[in-house]
UniProtKB/Swiss-Prot annotation:
Keyword RNA-binding part of the UniProt annotation: yes
One GO cellular component, as annotated: small ribosomal subunit
UniProt source species: Ruminiclostridium cellulolyticum (strain ATCC 35319 / DSM 5812 / JCM 6584 / H10) (Clostridium cellulolyticum)
Chain's role: One of the primary rRNA binding proteins, it binds directly to 16S rRNA where it nucleates assembly of the body of the 30S subunit. With S5 and S12 plays an important role in translational accuracy.
Name recorded for this polypeptide: Small ribosomal subunit protein uS4
PANTHER family referenced in this protein's UniProt entry, alphabetically: 30S 40S RIBOSOMAL PROTEIN, SMALL RIBOSOMAL SUBUNIT PROTEIN US4M
Pfam families: Ribosomal_S4, S4
InterPro entries membership: Ribosomal_uS4 (IPR022801), Ribosomal_uS4_bac-type (IPR005709), Ribosomal_uS4_CS (IPR018079), Ribosomal_uS4_N (IPR001912), S4_RNA-bd (IPR002942), S4_RNA-bd_sf (IPR036986)
One GO BP: translation
Residue ranges of domain S4 RNA-binding in the record: 98-164
Keywords assigned by UniProt, alphabetized: Ribonucleoprotein, Ribosomal protein, RNA-binding, rRNA-binding
Amino acid sequence: MARYTDASCRLCRREGEKLFLKGERCYTDKCSVARRPYAPGQHGQGRKKMSEYGIQLREKAKVRRFYGVLEGQFSKYFEVASRRKGITGENLLQILETRLDNVVYRLGLGTSRPESRQLVTHGHFTVNGKRVNIPSYLIKVGDVIAVADNSKNSPKVKSIREIAGGKVIPKWLEFDEENLVGKVVALPAREDIDLPIKEHLIVELYSK
Protein backbone atom coordinates (compact mmCIF):
# COMPACT_ATOMS: atom_id res chain seq x y z
CA MET A 1 0.00 0.00 0.00
CA ALA A 2 1.36 3.44 -0.93
CA ARG A 3 2.03 5.85 1.89
CA TYR A 4 3.92 8.99 2.82
CA THR A 5 7.56 8.39 3.67
CA ASP A 6 8.66 11.97 4.39
CA ALA A 7 9.16 13.03 8.01
CA SER A 8 5.94 14.34 9.56
CA CYS A 9 7.53 17.53 10.88
CA ARG A 10 8.95 18.35 7.45
CA LEU A 11 5.46 18.08 5.97
CA CYS A 12 4.16 20.58 8.53
CA ARG A 13 6.98 23.02 7.85
CA ARG A 14 6.44 22.69 4.11
CA GLU A 15 2.80 23.75 4.53
CA GLY A 16 3.72 26.51 6.98
CA GLU A 17 1.34 25.33 9.72
CA LYS A 18 0.65 22.46 12.08
CA LEU A 19 -0.94 19.39 10.50
CA PHE A 20 -1.12 17.61 13.88
CA LEU A 21 0.62 14.49 12.58
CA LYS A 22 2.64 13.78 15.74
CA GLY A 23 -0.08 13.72 18.37
CA GLU A 24 0.88 15.14 21.76
CA ARG A 25 4.17 16.61 20.46
CA CYS A 26 2.23 19.09 18.27
CA TYR A 27 0.89 20.83 21.39
CA THR A 28 4.30 21.33 23.02
CA ASP A 29 7.27 23.64 22.42
CA LYS A 30 8.97 20.69 20.72
CA CYS A 31 6.77 21.25 17.67
CA SER A 32 8.99 21.80 14.64
CA VAL A 33 6.70 24.49 13.18
CA ALA A 34 6.91 26.50 16.39
CA ARG A 35 10.71 26.23 16.52
CA ARG A 36 11.40 26.70 12.79
CA PRO A 37 8.42 28.39 11.11
CA TYR A 38 9.78 28.18 7.58
CA ALA A 39 10.01 25.55 4.84
CA PRO A 40 12.68 22.85 5.14
CA GLY A 41 15.76 22.85 2.94
CA GLN A 42 18.58 25.23 2.08
CA HIS A 43 16.26 27.92 0.67
CA GLY A 44 13.38 27.40 3.08
CA GLN A 45 13.53 30.87 4.59
CA GLY A 46 13.46 32.55 1.19
CA ARG A 47 10.22 31.10 -0.16
CA LYS A 48 8.98 33.07 -3.18
CA LYS A 49 5.49 34.45 -3.56
CA MET A 50 3.27 31.81 -5.17
CA SER A 51 0.94 32.18 -8.13
CA GLU A 52 -2.80 31.64 -7.75
CA TYR A 53 -2.37 28.14 -9.20
CA GLY A 54 0.47 27.45 -6.78
CA ILE A 55 -1.68 28.54 -3.83
CA GLN A 56 -4.45 26.18 -4.96
CA LEU A 57 -2.00 23.29 -5.29
CA ARG A 58 -0.60 23.96 -1.82
CA GLU A 59 -4.09 23.99 -0.31
CA LYS A 60 -4.87 20.64 -1.87
CA ALA A 61 -1.56 19.22 -0.65
CA LYS A 62 -2.25 20.54 2.85
CA VAL A 63 -5.68 18.90 3.02
CA ARG A 64 -4.30 15.62 1.68
CA ARG A 65 -1.66 15.66 4.39
CA PHE A 66 -4.12 16.56 7.13
CA TYR A 67 -6.05 13.38 6.35
CA GLY A 68 -3.20 11.22 5.03
CA VAL A 69 -4.77 10.70 1.61
CA LEU A 70 -2.78 10.12 -1.57
CA GLU A 71 -3.43 11.90 -4.86
CA GLY A 72 -5.47 9.21 -6.65
CA GLN A 73 -7.80 8.61 -3.74
CA PHE A 74 -8.22 12.34 -3.15
CA SER A 75 -9.27 12.83 -6.79
CA LYS A 76 -11.85 10.06 -6.43
CA TYR A 77 -13.24 11.71 -3.30
CA PHE A 78 -13.57 14.97 -5.21
CA GLU A 79 -15.46 13.23 -8.03
CA VAL A 80 -17.91 11.77 -5.51
CA ALA A 81 -18.26 15.14 -3.76
CA SER A 82 -18.99 16.93 -7.03
CA ARG A 83 -21.84 14.52 -7.84
CA ARG A 84 -23.55 14.97 -4.48
CA LYS A 85 -26.15 17.61 -3.81
CA GLY A 86 -24.90 20.63 -1.91
CA ILE A 87 -21.62 22.54 -1.87
CA THR A 88 -18.81 20.51 -3.44
CA GLY A 89 -16.07 21.72 -1.09
CA GLU A 90 -18.11 20.95 2.01
CA ASN A 91 -19.09 17.57 0.57
CA LEU A 92 -15.40 16.79 0.11
CA LEU A 93 -14.57 17.63 3.72
CA GLN A 94 -17.53 15.57 4.89
CA ILE A 95 -16.20 12.53 3.03
CA LEU A 96 -12.72 12.99 4.51
CA GLU A 97 -14.13 13.42 8.03
CA THR A 98 -16.12 10.19 7.81
CA ARG A 99 -13.12 8.00 7.01
CA LEU A 100 -12.76 5.40 9.76
CA ASP A 101 -9.25 6.50 10.72
CA ASN A 102 -10.44 10.09 11.15
CA VAL A 103 -13.49 9.04 13.18
CA VAL A 104 -11.21 7.04 15.49
CA TYR A 105 -9.07 10.16 15.92
CA ARG A 106 -12.11 12.39 16.53
CA LEU A 107 -13.30 9.99 19.24
CA GLY A 108 -9.99 10.42 21.05
CA LEU A 109 -8.93 6.81 20.43
CA GLY A 110 -5.76 7.91 18.65
CA THR A 111 -3.47 10.83 19.48
CA SER A 112 -3.04 11.70 15.79
CA ARG A 113 -4.53 10.67 12.46
CA PRO A 114 -1.42 8.67 11.47
CA GLU A 115 -1.57 6.76 14.76
CA SER A 116 -5.32 6.19 14.34
CA ARG A 117 -4.69 4.88 10.82
CA GLN A 118 -2.13 2.42 12.17
CA LEU A 119 -4.49 1.23 14.91
CA VAL A 120 -7.24 0.60 12.35
CA THR A 121 -4.84 -1.28 10.08
CA HIS A 122 -3.83 -3.50 13.00
CA GLY A 123 -7.46 -4.50 13.55
CA HIS A 124 -8.16 -2.78 16.86
CA PHE A 125 -11.68 -1.56 15.90
CA THR A 126 -15.07 -2.89 14.89
CA VAL A 127 -17.88 -1.20 12.97
CA ASN A 128 -21.34 -2.47 13.82
CA GLY A 129 -19.77 -5.48 15.53
CA LYS A 130 -17.52 -6.50 12.62
CA ARG A 131 -13.79 -5.95 12.62
CA VAL A 132 -12.68 -3.43 9.97
CA ASN A 133 -9.00 -2.83 9.18
CA ILE A 134 -9.40 -0.43 6.24
CA PRO A 135 -8.59 3.18 7.26
CA SER A 136 -10.48 4.63 4.27
CA TYR A 137 -13.71 2.80 5.15
CA LEU A 138 -16.46 5.43 5.08
CA ILE A 139 -18.68 5.60 8.14
CA LYS A 140 -22.42 6.30 7.85
CA VAL A 141 -24.94 7.85 10.23
CA GLY A 142 -25.97 5.22 12.76
CA ASP A 143 -22.73 3.24 12.55
CA VAL A 144 -21.24 2.12 15.87
CA ILE A 145 -17.45 2.14 16.21
CA ALA A 146 -15.90 0.24 19.10
CA VAL A 147 -12.54 -0.96 20.33
CA ALA A 148 -12.40 -4.70 19.65
CA ASP A 149 -12.84 -6.77 22.81
CA ASN A 150 -9.39 -8.33 22.57
CA SER A 151 -7.80 -4.90 22.15
CA LYS A 152 -9.32 -3.11 25.16
CA ASN A 153 -6.57 -4.30 27.50
CA SER A 154 -3.68 -3.89 25.08
CA PRO A 155 -0.91 -1.57 26.39
CA LYS A 156 -1.18 0.56 23.25
CA VAL A 157 -4.89 1.28 23.64
CA LYS A 158 -4.51 1.88 27.38
CA SER A 159 -1.74 4.43 26.86
CA ILE A 160 -3.78 6.25 24.20
CA ARG A 161 -6.78 6.49 26.50
CA GLU A 162 -4.58 8.06 29.20
CA ILE A 163 -3.24 10.68 26.79
CA ALA A 164 -6.40 11.39 24.80
CA GLY A 165 -8.91 11.01 27.63
CA GLY A 166 -11.14 14.03 28.10
CA LYS A 167 -10.83 15.11 24.48
CA VAL A 168 -13.75 17.22 23.23
CA ILE A 169 -15.90 15.04 20.97
CA PRO A 170 -17.54 16.69 17.92
CA LYS A 171 -21.32 17.03 18.18
CA TRP A 172 -21.84 14.69 15.21
CA LEU A 173 -20.40 11.86 17.31
CA GLU A 174 -21.36 10.23 20.61
CA PHE A 175 -18.84 8.41 22.79
CA ASP A 176 -19.20 6.03 25.72
CA GLU A 177 -15.80 6.45 27.36
CA GLU A 178 -16.31 3.61 29.84
CA ASN A 179 -17.04 1.01 27.15
CA LEU A 180 -14.93 2.63 24.39
CA VAL A 181 -17.86 2.77 21.98
CA GLY A 182 -18.67 5.62 19.62
CA LYS A 183 -21.63 6.30 17.35
CA VAL A 184 -22.15 8.59 14.35
CA VAL A 185 -25.34 10.54 15.08
CA ALA A 186 -25.13 12.96 12.13
CA LEU A 187 -22.94 13.90 9.21
CA PRO A 188 -20.40 16.62 10.08
CA ALA A 189 -21.43 20.15 9.11
CA ARG A 190 -18.82 22.67 7.94
CA GLU A 191 -18.77 24.41 11.32
CA ASP A 192 -17.91 21.09 12.98
CA ILE A 193 -14.59 20.86 11.11
CA ASP A 194 -11.98 22.85 13.02
CA LEU A 195 -9.15 22.67 10.50
CA PRO A 196 -7.72 25.76 8.72
CA ILE A 197 -8.91 24.70 5.27
CA LYS A 198 -9.98 26.88 2.34
CA GLU A 199 -11.87 24.25 0.37
CA HIS A 200 -12.99 26.73 -2.29
CA LEU A 201 -9.38 26.84 -3.54
CA ILE A 202 -9.49 23.10 -4.18
CA VAL A 203 -12.79 23.39 -6.04
CA GLU A 204 -11.31 26.17 -8.17
CA LEU A 205 -8.26 23.99 -8.92
CA TYR A 206 -10.32 21.04 -10.13
CA SER A 207 -12.60 23.34 -12.12
CA LYS A 208 -9.78 24.39 -14.45
